[in-house]
Amino acid sequence: REGRKRQGKMMDEKTIKKIVERVVNEKLGDKLYPGQTVETDEGFTKVKDPSGILKIAQSTVRCEPFEQQGVALKDVTTLEEAPNMGCGIMELNHTSFEWTLTYDEYDIVLDGTLEIEIDGRIVKAGPGEIIFIPKNSHIHFQTPDFTRYVYVTYPADWQ
């Protein structure tokens, strides 16, 4: 059956979504203005303003496995929302992986230690620190423990 019973009435999926979005909004302590929407469809909380401004609650982003054990990521903007720059969250867990960037990338460390190895040298960053990696760099992303960071790419379509 579609929906859930509440005091003898059926609640459809749209009503349930509105209730969930209202609860999430209250939990985040935000006031929505006319035209703003809260979306949770992508598995995390995103506030959209009609101007195109977005706010992503990074703590709600759940990364998905990517290419090898110990590497997970989640893009948090779509090409429709941000056609020029990409953004997402990446997590590394006691791992290293080799990558050649065909784009420019900023990495903003949220938790743990991120190490970028290039030509035998290591650039290390901790929470609150930012690393810039220029296009065409052949590197190893690595961490001695666990790290979670925001990546921002230009151009947006990094894959």
Say what each PLM segment does:
Residues V71-L101, K135, D157-W158:
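Conserved short histidine dyad/triad with adjacent acidic residue
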